[in-house]
A protein has these predicted regions:
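Acidic/histidine-rich helix-loop elements
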Residues: 105-119, 140-146, 213-229
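Active-site neighborhood of phospho(di)ester-bond hydrolases with catalytic His/Asp-centered motifs
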Residues: 107-111, 131-137, 163-171, 257-261, ...
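Acidic-and-aromatic substrate-binding clefts and catalytic sites of carbohydrate-active enzymes
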Residues: 112-117, 140-146, 174-175, 268-269, ...
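A general structural motif
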Residues: 103, 129, 162, 248-255, ...
Length: 365
């Protein structure tokens, strides 16, 4: 049985659902039991068996109330047009801990670039936490599907299938032969890598800036079309605002997070000074309508907090405090530093911790 449960499942918050996802090495059928109801990895009524990562979507309310779920795997002997041969179902039950109402602890990992042990150590330095934020470039590129396993290994080691995670795509994730299938290997909402989510009294929105240079940059070799992708997100953001009573103004929301791998309030030098009009519109809509408490970013490989009155930083415009919380070193010994968050009424505390067991800096924003 252990070969089928090599990794604990990852439980990702997407919209008003949890996507329970788990990598597998052999063909099998995958379903999850929550309470007395089964949820299946199926496509239009057909159980999937050939995918490398299974996905089952469960309503948040159901799993939060049940506080446990059972992963069910039925190994395939031979899948045939008639009388498919299978083995008996293997089951493993996991406890599940919904995000609490107060003193909510989260840890942010970005730009790990294929490191696993080091970001895990940095997170463990912060201590126990209630949910994990994976904010882009967890892998170094999407040229090899085996790299996606690193995402699930980090979730497995830190969350153990018992607590939720939030996932955002980074610019390096757009590179390589399997980048076009990235959403098949990671959480998404209707195929999109941008969406809102809810965890307890926390509401959040993920925006995906795509690549960090113009679409026609030679590095991409005509393989990206991020401008139209960003235009779609402008319309998505407007729809979120139109539906605000079911989104960031819904009953019970106390904290509003903006998560994006790229720091789009800060204009970098050419060729990284892209999409100034689109980003200006995002900033205006977010600042005037959504009003998030904090913008959680990576990309720059640094550990910093920038406030709205910092005109040097907010060259595209300001929304709220920006926390950049991911630093990595892969030469002369692997090293990683990330960022812990503690959310309380009227206060957010950030703690930068590293893989050497050090707390580098703490700050209340």
């Amino acid at each position: 049985m252990s070969e089928y449960f090599k990794y604990n499942p990852a439980v990702f918050a997407v919209d008003k659902y949890y996507q329970i996802m788990m990598p597998v090495e052999e063909q099998n059928l995958f379903f999850v039991k929550v309470g007395d109801k089964y949820y299946y990895d199926e496509s239009n009524g057909i159980m999937r068996s050939r995918n490398e990562i299974h996905r089952v979507e469960v309503p948040m309310k159901a799993l939060d109330e049940a506080m446990e779920y059972t992963v069910c795997i039925r190994p395939i002997i031979e899948r045939k047009p008639y009388f498919t041969e299978t083995e008996e179902v293997l089951e493993k039950t996991y406890k599940f801990y919904p995000v609490p109402e107060n003193n909510i602890r989260a840890y942010h990992i970005s730009d790990a670039h294929n490191l696993v042990a080091e970001p895990v150590k940095a997170a463990e330095t912060f201590g126990d936490f209630d949910f994990l934020i994976l904010n882009g470039d967890v892998i170094d590129h999407s040229g090899d599907p085996s790299k996606f396993i690193n995402i699930y290994e980090i979730c497995s080691l830190l969350m153990k299938g018992e607590k939720p995670s939030v996932f955002s795509r980074g610019n390096h994730d757009l590179r390589g032969n399997f980048a076009e299938k990235f959403a098949d290997y990671t959480p998404n909402h209707l195929g999109n890598t941008y969406y809102s989510f809810r965890l307890g009294n926390i509401w959040g929105i993920l925006l995906d800036c795509g690549e960090d240079k113009p679409d026609d940059h030679a590095e991409y070799g005509f393989t990206v079309a991020c401008h139209v992708f960003r235009e779609r997100q402008t319309e998505f953001l407007k729809k979120v605002i139109e539906n605000k009573e079911n989104e960031y103004e819904a009953e019970g929301v106390k904290h509003k997070l903006l998560i994006a791998h790229n720091t789009f309030t800060h204009r970098l030098p050419p060729p990284f000074d892209i999409e100034q009009e689109i980003f200006a519109e995002w900033i205006k809509l977010l600042k005037e309508e959504v009003k998030p408490e904090v913008m959680i970013c990576g990309h720059l490989h640094e550990l910093s907090v920038y406030y709205p009155d910092n005109t040097y930083w907010n060259t595209n415009g300001s929304i709220c405090p920006v926390v950049v919380g991911g630093d990595v070193q892969k030469r002369d010994g692997a090293y990683f530093a990330g960022c812990g968050y503690i959310f309380n009424d009227g206060e957010i505390k950030v703690s930068f911790t590293d893989s050497c067991g050090k707390t580098l800096k703490e700050q209340i924003i």
